């Protein structure tokens, strides 16, 4: 009987581990920080090149030769692009332009453009002010006449950089367009053959319309051509499975089964492990047909992961320390911390490919050599490899007997040398003091791999099981999808006094560092797994005020533009938003710590902020809140609710410090404000968006802290009324943010759902978000801002705010478990 029971328990354990996530908009492969973050946006691993979260290509390639037949299981390989119509960056190009609407036929070849101005691409403002021609209006139309010496073009490539929305025509035909989009560097897009056929030797027209509704502006374009590679044999992908720390694929390669596992060991409770910028890629081969096989696995990493722009040159060197061989790749002529901004990638420090297996051969390859290898041949030609990608390559032969297995593991890491600048001082990553050098870290990481794999397997199972208990299977899968993405939008840095600093980058929503209203939605993940990380997000903002560098009576919005944290760079404040956020986050830290010390340390600053909330929080003036994409809003009921909860949280902390008089005073104010709020916002069967606009509604996600902190400011009837109303307002892919638009923020939906007092209503509210996760056609790292009618991304992606999905787990931990 005991044996049967033990077998049953083991079976349940296996089922639990396997019951993870099979479908995502994009799949995390290598995820550590905002600069070291590689994804695939296809369900099949070998359908497309891998990319950085920004969409810039950062190619990983995997090939397996089985008995002299080569299969590609990872990434894609394209021939180098040869420029045929140069873009303007670095060599401005002549064209015609107008900033006045030219009418409907402006893109037609025969259009009369004689009244247009002469200028040079690129056009723009901002972005370092290095545009050839300034562009400051809302729209620009550009026409460029070009000739071609050769029409032998196998594959036509559009080379384009735009900020923001753009439409591009070639010889009167639409070649490319996108809305609510921008890119910060030249990117390449394959153009279909029907447009290629319109090309002629003389008088072709490239016509572009770009709009600039906000912020910086840029447009630059050219054309290139590629030779089409030979049709390659692809491994047959059988499955993909995502857990909190791992993404695993299985393939059929003739008579051999191949399993590839990407492990980024982001264990939030283990600062040493969390800070290590090293992922493990494990290859396991197994005979599936009862026969012995000779196999050879090649894994290649493009030098692009160490540069921001294609034109930058990288240098690859090799070495060995103890039993670990390595290659490292970095840009020549580096400037450490030399770039800041949103759509940018790192171009300082070094990418490392390493192996402790003596049979593993590490070498440097070019694009042409990789294509030759994928075709099962050796490249004999010599000559210039200029403009080709350079690859760090690992190859190993694994011979397997019939019905047997064999495996090999490589490590891919990144040493950024210095991670951020913190008030003019360059700071190293957390791991540097512990391990000294990347060589030392790689050796330690190699030795630790068996224990790390076990630890990650156990953590993945525990996270999933806890999430199922908190909110059900769909909720658990949402948490799995959010975990790595949220943590990898941060960087764990050591302060000058050994303090933990955990800044995040505001990915594709401004590029700011230490944004308070990004920390606020991200916080639940850290509160569940390691509140020390939340302190590393919150305390620098407090210290900015305490230093005297920030003198306003409310907190700053941010500390700069990633990775430079030298003071706020966002052009507008969010007074009530950030004051409420900081007080609520401090109270949450104290609850998680079961200790009031953190608040006590900064009590004077918190007291100044709560006075601001008392004065300005009940009925907020016209101002931005965290949902700044929706614009300024006065008399915002949800923002008022945040202020009221913040005042109540301050009272709670005062009580824990033994100051009964202050606690009573502020709790009384919060209760009075809550009562007034109910009267001002009441719309009968729900509460309004603003106090002065009838017939409106909004998600009151800020109410969740009244529940989680046990403030008891609002009666249960407020929760019940709002939740019941929300259920009537849902669309196919979620509950809209409010009555103004049909888009939503999925992190806020998760908070709103947690207001429900039963699992049925909670799951009813999150199910459309699960549907969005698994059915959206927007193939990018999970966007938290999407359209509820069609499930498409509106903007923003790969942000840390999906850590807010863990709010239900936080409720389970604090109020249920």
Regions found by a protein language model. Name each.
Residues 38-42, 62-66, 251, 282-288, ...:
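Well-ordered alpha-helical scaffold segments within catalytic/enzyme domains
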Residues 20-28, 37-38, 78-108, 206, ...:
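Acidic/polar, glycine-enriched structural segments that form the non-catalytic walls/loops
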Residues 55-81, 101-102, 165, 227-235, ...:
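Carboxylate/His-rich catalytic cores and anion/metal-binding grooves
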Residues 437-452, 511-620, 636-654:
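Aromatic-rich carbohydrate-recognition surfaces in CAZymes
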Residues 323-377, 506-518, 524-531, 550, ...:
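Extended ligand-binding clefts on enzyme/binding-domain cores
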Residues 161, 167-224:
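Beta-strand-rich ligand-recognition modules
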Residues 116, 138, 146-172, 206-208:
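Aromatic-lined ligand-binding clefts that engage carbohydrates, nucleic acids, or primary amines
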Residues 305-306, 486-494, 531-552, 591, ...:
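Long, well-ordered core segments of solenoidal/helical folds
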């Amino acid at each position: 009987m005991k044996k049967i029971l033990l077998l049953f328990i083991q079976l349940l354990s296996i089922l639990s581990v396997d019951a993870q996530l099979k479908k995502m908009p994009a799949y995390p492969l290598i995820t550590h920080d905002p600069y070291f973050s590689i994804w695939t946006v296809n369900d099949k691993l070998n359908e497309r090149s891998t990319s950085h979260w920004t969409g810039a290509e950062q190619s990983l390639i995997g090939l397996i030769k089985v008995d002299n037949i080569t299969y590609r299981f990872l990434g894609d390989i394209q021939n180098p692009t040869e420029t045929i119509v140069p873009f303007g960056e670095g060599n401005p190009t002549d064209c015609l332009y107008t900033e006045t609407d030219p009418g409907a036929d402006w893109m037609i070849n025969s259009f009369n453009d004689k009244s247009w101005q002469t200028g040079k691409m690129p056009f723009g403002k901002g972005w370092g002010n290095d545009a050839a021609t300034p562009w400051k209006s809302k729209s620009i139309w550009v026409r460029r006449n070009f000739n071609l010496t050769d029409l032998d073009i196998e594959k036509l490539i559009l080379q384009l950089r735009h900020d923001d929305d753009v439409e591009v025509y070639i010889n009167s035909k639409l070649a490319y367009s996108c809305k609510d989009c921008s890119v910060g560097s030249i990117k390449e897009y394959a153009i279909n053959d029907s447009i290629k056929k319109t090309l002629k030797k003389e008088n072709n027209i490239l016509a572009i319309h770009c709009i600039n509704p906000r912020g910086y502006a840029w447009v630059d374009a050219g054309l290139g051509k590629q030779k089409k590679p030979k049709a390659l044999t692809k491994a047959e992908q059988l499955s993909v499975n995502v857990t909190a720390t791992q993404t695993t694929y299985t393939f059929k390669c003739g008579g051999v089964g191949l399993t590839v596992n990407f492990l980024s060991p982001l264990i939030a409770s283990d600062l040493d492990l969390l800070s290590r910028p090293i992922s493990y890629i494990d290859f396991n081969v197994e005979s599936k047909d009862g026969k012995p096989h000779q196999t050879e696995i090649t894994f290649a990493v493009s030098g692009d992961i160490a540069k921001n722009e294609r034109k930058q040159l990288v240098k690859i060197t090799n070495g060995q320390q103890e039993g670990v061989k390595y290659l490292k790749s970095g840009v020549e002529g580096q400037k450490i911390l030399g770039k800041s901004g949103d759509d940018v990638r790192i171009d300082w420090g070094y990418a490392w490919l390493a192996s402790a297996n003596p049979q593993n051969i590490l070498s440097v390859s070019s694009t042409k050599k990789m294509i030759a290898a994928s075709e099962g041949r050796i490249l004999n030609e010599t000559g210039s490899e200029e403009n080709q990608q350079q690859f760090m390559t690992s190859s190993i032969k694994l011979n397997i007997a019939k019905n047997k297995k064999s495996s090999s593991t490589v490590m891919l890491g990144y040493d950024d040398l210095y991670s951020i600048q913190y008030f003019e001082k360059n700071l190293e990553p957390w791991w540097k003091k512990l391990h000294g050098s990347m060589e030392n870290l790689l050796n330690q990481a190699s030795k630790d791999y068996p224990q790390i794999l076990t630890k990650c397997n156990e953590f993945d199972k525990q996270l999933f099981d806890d999430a199922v208990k908190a909110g059900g299977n769909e909720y658990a899968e949402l948490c799995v999808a959010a975990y790595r993405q949220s943590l990898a939008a941060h960087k764990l840095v050591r302060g000058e006094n050994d303090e933990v600093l955990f800044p995040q980058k505001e990915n594709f929503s401004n590029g700011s560092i230490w944004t308070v209203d990004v920390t606020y939605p991200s916080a639940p993940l850290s509160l569940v797994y390691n509140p020390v990380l939340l302190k590393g997000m919150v305390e620098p903002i407090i210290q900015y005020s305490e230093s005297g560098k920030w003198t306003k009576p409310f907190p700053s919005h941010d500390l700069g533009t990633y990775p430079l944290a030298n003071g706020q760079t966002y052009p507008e404040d969010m007074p009530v938003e950030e004051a409420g956020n900081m007080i609520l986050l401090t109270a949450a830290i104290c609850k998680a710590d079961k200790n009031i010390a953190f608040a006590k340390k900064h009590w004077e600053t918190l007291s100044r902020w709560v006075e601001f909330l008392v004065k300005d929080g009940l009925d907020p003036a016209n101002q931005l809140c965290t949902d700044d994409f929706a614009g300024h809003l006065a008399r915002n009921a949800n923002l008022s609710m945040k202020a009221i909860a913040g005042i109540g949280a301050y009272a709670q902390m005062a009580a824990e410090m033994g100051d009964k008089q202050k606690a009573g005073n502020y709790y009384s104010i919060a209760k009075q404000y809550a009562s007034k709020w109910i009267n001002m916002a009441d719309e009968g069967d729900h509460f309004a968006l603003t106090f002065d606009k009838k017939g409106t509604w909004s998600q009151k996600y800020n109410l969740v802290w009244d529940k989680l902190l046990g403030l008891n400011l609002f009666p249960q009837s407020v929760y019940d009324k709002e939740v019941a109303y929300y259920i009537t307002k849902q669309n196919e892919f979620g509950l809209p943010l409010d009555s103004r638009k049909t888009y939503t923020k999925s992190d806020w939906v998760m908070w709103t759902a947690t207001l429900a007092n039963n699992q049925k209503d909670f799951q009813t509210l999150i199910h459309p978000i699960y549907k969005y996760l698994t059915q959206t056609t927007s193939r990018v790292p999970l966007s938290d801002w999407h359209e509820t009618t069609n499930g498409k991304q509106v903007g923003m992606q790969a942000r840390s705010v999906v850590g807010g999905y863990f709010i239900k787990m936080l409720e389970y931990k604090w109020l249920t478990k």
